[in-house]
Amino acid sequence: MEWFEALILGVLQGLTEYLPVSSSGHLAIGSALFGIQGEDNLTFTIAVHVATVLSTLVILWKEIGWIFRGLFKFEMNAETKYVINILVSMIPIGIVGVFFKDYVEEIFGSGLLIVGCMLLLTALLLAFSYYAKPRLKENISMKDAFIIGLAQACAVMPGLSRSGTTIATGLLLGDNKAKLAQFSFLMVIPPILGEALLDGMKIVKGAAAGTSDISVLSLVVGFLAAFISGCVACKWMINIVKKGKLIYFAIYCAIAGAVTIACTLM
């Protein structure tokens, strides 16, 4: 992987991790265009995912600080309930990671046709949430957190946007727009770090076998590109959800999905 390829893919990851257009789908398309695969692709994916987690921590540091201050009061307050909701939302993705990880990895290697189909499904979800009748829930309930977690578990499919799926699900449930976007970005931090740890163990084994030769420069460039673009996209996406402008991303996903399918079948 050349440094300029890492730059492009890093920016792509940073933007699409938060914008509801599927980071996994766009990374798969970008990697296919650049001919990047195997251990190099896995190493780079870990680096840019960790970068976007860091960008979440930077943009939402006030909310994270609020959570930890409340936790250390050691009482059942709003902050403790928030953490419980995040833990509840992790149950479905945890089950998928433990029992279906190999199956999911097979799907990721099945080509771009599935990516195109899932992009179309993302478009439908965003469109449904846009036209859904708005309801006013002040806080995300434990039940809603679990349902949103189910949506996140489904979004392991390449091309099905995690942020788009979770936010659209929350909107259909009638949750508060601003709080929903923040919850969606915070709930994914533990699963991403857990997956990065597991994949990192694979990289260590691969390095011992000499199966990865991606340069340090490419990793650093990709990491910084993903972090900076992720900071911009995270803040932007929160404002987009507040203003209810997801329909534009539904149109984009529909076009991107259709083009991907057409190119795959040609």
From Swiss-Prot:
Domain of life of the native organism? Bacteria
Q: What's one GO-annotated cellular component? A: plasma membrane
**EC number(s) given by UniProt:** 3.6.1.27
The protein's matches in PANTHER family, at most eight in alphabetical order, are given as: UNDECAPRENYL-DIPHOSPHATASE
- Report the locations given in the UniProt record: Cell inner membrane
Q: Which reaction does it catalyse?
A: di-trans,octa-cis-undecaprenyl diphosphate + H2O = di-trans,octa-cis-undecaprenyl phosphate + phosphate + H(+)
What taxonomic classification does the UniProt entry list for its organism?
Bacteria, Pseudomonadati, Bacteroidota, Bacteroidia, Bacteroidales
Would you tell me the protein name for this molecule?
Undecaprenyl-diphosphatase
GO terms for biological process, alphabetical: cell wall organization; peptidoglycan biosynthetic process; regulation of cell shape; response to antibiotic
| Primary residence | membrane
**Which UniProt keyword terms apply here?**
Antibiotic resistance, Cell inner membrane, Cell membrane, Cell shape, Cell wall biogenesis/degradation, Hydrolase, Membrane, Peptidoglycan synthesis, Transmembrane, Transmembrane helix
Query: GO molecular-function annotation terms?
Result: undecaprenyl-diphosphatase activity
Print the miscellaneous field: Bacitracin is thought to be involved in the inhibition of peptidoglycan synthesis by sequestering undecaprenyl diphosphate, thereby reducing the pool of lipid carrier available.
Which HAMAP family does this chain map to?
Undec_diphosphatase
Matches recorded under InterPro entries: UppP
Q: Which ranges does the record mark as transmembrane?
A: 41-61, 80-100, 107-127, 140-160, 180-200, 214-234, 246-266
What exactly does this protein do? Catalyzes the dephosphorylation of undecaprenyl diphosphate (UPP). Confers resistance to bacitracin.
